[in-house]
Amino acid sequence: MGVPVYNSDERAKGLMQKSPELIAAIKELLGDAAYKEGKLDRGYVSKQVFNNKELLNALNAIVHPAVRKDFISWAESQSSDYVIQEAAIIFEIGSQDFYDFIILVTAPKETKIDRIMQRDASNTVEGIEARMKNQLSDNKKIESSHYIIQNENIEQTKVQVLDVHRDLLNKI
């Protein structure tokens, strides 16, 4: 299909690693221990923020404006009919109004946990559930999404993705 996809989590990790402004703000919020040997200590940061809503909100307030700015710059450099921004917490940070359309990709909780564990073995079930606890339920997200893709079976998922793609091309 050739649609460029901006992975917000990966870009955020990169920005938190390279942006002097973000590094300084994160150290101010979480202390110098947030970086170990010049690299973001994701384990430390996760332990600090995922059980402290106030710290999580403060970290989001630091990181997400930088990600938004980076996304806009990236999107403007693309030449496709449309772009996709993959982001897990659109509704939680109140950025849903930035998008023309929201595509929610969902799966059963157990499937999500299994996939996250396969993608990054350093995760624990408890850590994943702590992050999920800070996210809205899929049922709440469905109410505000334009498209819903059930991602349980790869063949059915491909059909749904192609349907959404065709519909978006017709709306542009």
Report the location of each language-model feature.
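Small-molecule kinase domains that catalyze NTP-dependent phosphoryl transfer to phosphate-bearing small molecules
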Residues: 79, 97-98, 119-168
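Short, acidic/turn-prone active-site loops that include or flank metal/cofactor-
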Residues: 10-13, 34, 108-111, 130, ...
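ATP-dependent NMP and nucleoside kinases share a basic, alpha-helical "lid"
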Residues: 69-77, 82-117
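Hydrophobic/aromatic beta-strand patches that form the interior of the parallel beta-sheet core
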Residues: 6, 103, 147-149
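An amphipathic alpha-helix signature
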Residues: 1, 23, 27, 109-117, ...
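Residue-level signal for inorganic ion chemistry
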Residues: 9, 59, 84, 149, ...
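A conserved segment at the C-terminal end of the G1
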Residues: 1-7
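ATP-dependent small-molecule kinase phosphotransfer cores
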Residues: 10-79
